């Protein structure tokens, strides 16, 4: 489903058994590269000794895989402070339907195949700019549909700190319909020094 509803005939791939490793943690840069079947709590347990965590804190963190969270553009209770998945994914390595493995990331670093995809999507964004401006939901936690506004941000929060384009953000929220993820490069955050619970 593209918006969270049930699906009819579909292919569901469970990566959580064989495709769940932490491939790299760069403490200095505050990044981690992971396979899509890794469960969020398992990642955060490995990051805790480094004083880091992945701040997209969904309530199902004991079961939620990073690939599934990316596919859904998951948020979490602290998304107002940290953003949702699209704000915390720096890159993705993914297979296209042709079987070609492509690196998705900052536009300035794209290889020829990814640059061609970026050019095509940018053309769509320009062609439909008026419709995007008129109809794109102006909400902080938009989690449904393709992020066609990566070239002309319509989100209240910029996708990147410097406003640059990151093609990996096109895959976030696409629920695997554009490519099949091999790995994700994630932006980490320092562990909070204190936590507060407010009850209304």
Language-model-derived ranges and their functions:
Residues 21-25, 31-200:
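FAD-binding subdomain of flavoenzyme oxidoreductases
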Residues 1-19, 34, 55:
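Glycine-rich N-terminal segment of FAD-binding domains in flavoprotein oxidoreductases
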């Amino acid at each position: 489903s593209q918006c969270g509803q049930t699906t009819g005939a579909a292919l569901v791939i469970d990566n959580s058994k064989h495709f769940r490793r932490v491939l790299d943690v760069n403490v200095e840069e505050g990044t981690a590269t992971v396979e899509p079947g890794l469960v969020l709590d398992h990642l955060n347990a490995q990051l805790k000794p480094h004083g880091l965590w992945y701040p997209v804190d969904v309530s199902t963190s004991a079961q939620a895989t990073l690939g599934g969270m990316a596919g859904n553009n998951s948020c979490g209770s602290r998304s107002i402070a940290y953003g949702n998945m699209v704000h915390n994914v720096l890159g993705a390595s993914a297979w296209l339907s042709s079987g070609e493995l492509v690196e998705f990331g900052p536009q300035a670093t794209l290889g020829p195949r990814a640059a061609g995809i970026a050019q095509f999507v940018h053309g769509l964004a320009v062609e439909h700019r008026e419709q995007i401006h008129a109809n794109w939901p102006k909400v902080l936690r938009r989690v449904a549909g393709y992020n066609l506004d990566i070239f002309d941000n319509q989100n209240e929060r910029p996708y990147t700190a410097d406003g640059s384009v990151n093609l990996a953000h096109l895959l976030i929220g696409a629920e695997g319909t554009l490519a099949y993820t091999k790995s994700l490069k994630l932006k980490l955050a320092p562990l909070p020094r204190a936590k507060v619970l407010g009850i209304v």
